[in-house]
Each structure stands twice: as structure tokens, then as C-alpha cells.
Amino acid sequence: MNNYLALFDNNMIQARSLSTIYINLRDNVHIEDKYISNLLKAQLVNIVSAFDMFLHGIVKKGVIEIFNKTRKETSKFQSFSFQAKTILRLLEVMSPNFIPSSSDEITDVILEKELSRQLSFMSFQSPDKVTDALSLIWNEQHKIQVLSDKMEISGSNINEKANNLKQKLTTIIQRRNQIAHEGDIEPTTQLPRSIELLDVELATDFIYALAHAVFDAVTAADCYS
């Protein structure tokens, strides 16, 4: 799973560069904010995409690990279904006498393609979608509570911390959706919504910390057989 975390980190570095460009254009070139604020909006969209891509990657990897008996099964995995043709193909390539003639005839490759097909219809962004996806590979019953503790989210108790995590993530996703799906136009005024550099920086830090907390949780020793 290290490769997926490294890819996520690289995507986040690229996303952060947009606010760096924004600051340079604002402070050194003195371009008005209305002409460059789309850089910040693009960064917000990109960090959510990076997180979604990261989750898709580790879920696929985790399911393959379960199939290979190196990761502990979860109840959600036990109810996960594959197409009949995929099952037949797996049985064929797993036969002791089968000799693969290409990389497409390797168990892990077949599984990854099938998982990519199934998961491509899903987005792992909102708190409920995130926990549902992680249930395929992580048996923890109180996922948000564990993640909020790892991230040191503020709150007077573990449930308040969990609620604060969910609220922060929901706010980021809602703002992302306004940009990506609504043209980021305020319905009443028909003018573009404003966006603040600090808000984008905080959102970026939050998504980065969340992904790393997820990685630490799903790669813990007790997740493996």
C-alpha cells in the first residue's frame, strides 16, 4: 500500500503548488483576486480527487490481500460479489497446471481489473462513503472515532471528536461539489462564490492528515493474518 500513499503525497504536493502560484501572482505580480481565485478552487477540487483516488487504491490492494490470505477478512468482504466470468477466470489461472502467457493471466491482475470496474462507479469522499469503503478491508467498528483520535481532532470526548471530523470532511466535500458541479455560482446573485486562501490551506492539511491516518489504521499489524 506504500505506493498508493506515495502517489497521494505527490498529488498533494502538486495541488499545494496552486496556492503557491496564487500567492506569487497576488503578492508579486499584483493581479486582482477575482482573476486568480480559480487556482484555489482548483486546489480544493484536486485534494479531494487525490483522497478519493488514494482510497480506491488501498481498498483494491486490501481486497487482493484478503483474497491472498495475507489480510484478515471483514464481514463486508464476505458479502462482496464478483462476476461469474471473473470467478471462472480465477479458477482457471489458479489451476496447478496453468502457465500464464501474459500479465493479464495473473490472479492479482485479474482481481485488480475486476475491482477497478466495480469501484469505478463509486466515490469515496463523504464520511459515510469513506467508512463504507474501508469496511471492505478494515474490521474496526468505530472507524471515525479511531481516525479522529489519530488526527488529534479537537473535542471534549471521542464522540464529539468523531462528529467534528465528519463535519469538517462534509464541509470540504460540499465546497468541492459547489465548484465541480455547480460552477461555484451563488444562486441568488448569480455571482461567483468567494474562496479564502486560509480555508483552502486548512482543507489541504486536513485531507492530508486524514489520508495518513487511514493508511496507518489499515496497515496496522492487527489487520494482517
Give names to the regions the model predicted.
Residues I47, V59-N159:
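Helix-loop junctions and short alpha-helical segments
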Residues V45-V48, I207:
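Hydrophobic aliphatic residue packing
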Residues N2-T20, H142-S225:
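Polyanionic, low-complexity intrinsically disordered segments
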Residues M1-V45, G57-I64, N68-S79:
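Charged alpha-helical initiation segments
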Residues S49-M53:
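Extended alpha-helical coiled-coil scaffold domains characteristic of the BAR superfamily
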